[in-house]
Amino acid sequence: MDRLRSHKAIFLLLLPVLVGCSIGDVRRPPPDRSSASPRPAPTVPTPSRAVGFDEVRHVRVAVDRRYDRPFVEFVDADHGYALFAACDGVPPGRGCTALLYATVDGGRSWQALRHPRPVAEDQQLYAVPGALVLLAEPYGWYTSTDGGASFVHTTGGEPAALVAARGRFQVAEGVGAVAEWDGAALRPLPAQPAVPGLNTVGHSGDLVVAAGARDGRPSAAVSRDAGRHWVSTPLPWRGDDVGVLRAVIAPDAGAWLVGERPDRTGFPALWRLVGGREWALVRAVGHPAQARSVAPLGAELVAVTSPDGVGVVAGGRYYRVDWPLTGEHHLTVLGDGTILARGPDDVVVGTGWTANRRWVRVVLAGG
């Protein structure tokens, strides 16, 4: 009876995005992969019909047309940054300096910021809660905690703001151990989980999940007391190889494991933590052979983009959904639960809860 109620609840969550679907939908063919290594054959593509955005925010700023498309990153649904960092494919120079912009209204408007090192061999932008971090090689890092009004310059390893953004518990690089960030350094915990090939940590409150894969076999351990004690938690496994295992905490604090395939393109294995100590293998009957991105949304739902389009795993099945996204969009979930979908030509922001979203296409251009 409980399972029946759960399936009914999941169906009600999905109903608003399923009502527009039809069995005869025609989908765009997958991109040409002839130059890549052999991969599993995808399901026969038949694309989804065009679905409109709820809003399009297309803004032009005073940037010379020689500049390439900017890199745009959002911290939450409202706050984002954009970096124009090349002209005609060439890194910024004296005649093409890096340009920095910020938005505080979800991309409706953009304000120019002073870039602290506009000429460099390579430019990168990282936007995390509470900080904007720029990397201008070979000069180092520039960190702002006031929305880009001022920057602090550092060299060497990643600045504290970037490390802190990964969470209180992390895997210490080069050590292969679960470590705790104390505000200044990552310090390995006295008690360590027995996880072969440890490579990922996720946490919510005092719950800490550590996982990894070795020789294709996934394994995990769980701590309920902030890493002081660990319990090995066997994973139901069907023998299909896992290349990289990722721990993901959904917006509702649910813990998931995503088992990426060795070729990084095959549809991944999925597990959900049940009762705090047991992993349930999540089935996805009808899923495509490949996946570009996977993002747990909460309420036992997982969003997927693939060469076949966009879908959601729910109640043991894979459902195609009427979202205005393509298989080229890569999904991430921001700290406020917003879905960020990055495509080759745009960034799409999806606000709302679970599968019911308001989709806004954000386009920033010069000229």
Per-range role (PLM):
Residues 77-83, 130-134, 168-170, 205-210, ...:
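Entry beta-strands of beta-propeller and related beta-repeat scaffolds
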